[in-house]
């Protein structure tokens, strides 16, 4: 537990204007996340499946959609660390962040006007790539907008407001879908899509405006700091030559050299994590395991209901219910972070998810599905928020973009291994209940690695 003096200091502070502006971006991007989870797959199939020219079967549509997600995941994982490292070097994080948001929002709105399923998937992948890139910069901004003792609470506010705020544009999008040809038939499928994507894109952009205006990058890598970071890796030809080239001039480097410098720094950081920053390395392993379990459950929630032949409308209602519970859960754990260590709360969240996985063995009706949704909501946002804030505390703030780029690789892997496990269980003849229950292994092993990270000597920049 933390000292009473620390608790008193934290309780006397409300969200500052910078913290509030940062939190609002979660409200914007979460709207797109919810749309992508609930309606985009449906709209994709409405364009792809049929007997018309260029249309395909439902199974092939599902397969192509999965391929699109895989492509998006790989590209996002590759460019994330490079984008973060460039922003750290050049003190231009705000400019690059703004660019990713504007392109992402524009692509989101354009998605509603696509006439074919192929173009729909191409624009969807483009939107998701820029959306994911924006999150690298956004997460790394946490070290600039607040202090270390408030990171848990501010990060939790971001997820909480995001879960709640995302329901507003989603309800409009859902109403447009209900009025479409699949249900009431009042409007065309094209108009339903245009409304859904446009409302989400506009919402995403408008709530980001305060962050555009208020954010200032405080932590960044100077030339001197950059040399210090690489001094232990000068035996590497690529890094050594890059440093020599950089020292020839004080002018801003060109784009290609900037990218080369960023790649060199990433290799140096990976070496540093492996050899010196082992606390960060152990946490990243733990994070990859338990967040993979989280992502798998989220991505397969509709499949769970479908396999159990549950009412589709009831599933959507419980999806919204989960958003509200996740909002409350994030706020509760944010308050608890004033009293308890971040790692203690992470243990609770991981244990909670472990219990949810075991509960899946008893799941057989819509009520049980709702109980499981409640359990997921209690810990979903809290686990994500506390992981983000804990990582912010144990990394050097001037390299936050670069470190969060690496963090993003692990986050983007969420549901990769878990989905393979679920597929293997299903192909072997197992039920969806058993498949979800196997996710408990990911949380158990992740718990062990988090314990190892927690016990490891903290680096100088940690203040947990």
Language-model segments: residues:
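Juxtamembrane intracellular "pre-TM" segments in multi-pass secondary transporters
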Residues: 6-19, 217-284
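Helix-loop boundary and gating motifs at the non-cytosolic
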Residues: 13-73, 279-318
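A membrane-interface helix-boundary motif in multi-pass transporters
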Residues: 56-59, 177-202, 424-443
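Helix-to-loop junctions at the C-terminal end of transmembrane segments
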Residues: 78-91, 328-341, 426
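Structural signature of the two symmetry-related core transmembrane helices
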Residues: 95-109, 344-359
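Helix-loop junctions at membrane interfaces in 12-TM secondary transporters
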Residues: 112-124, 361-372
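Glycine-rich segments within core transmembrane alpha-helices of 12-TM secondary carriers
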Residues: 155-177, 408-418
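Multi-pass alpha-helical transporter architecture, strongest
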Residues: 203-214, 437-464
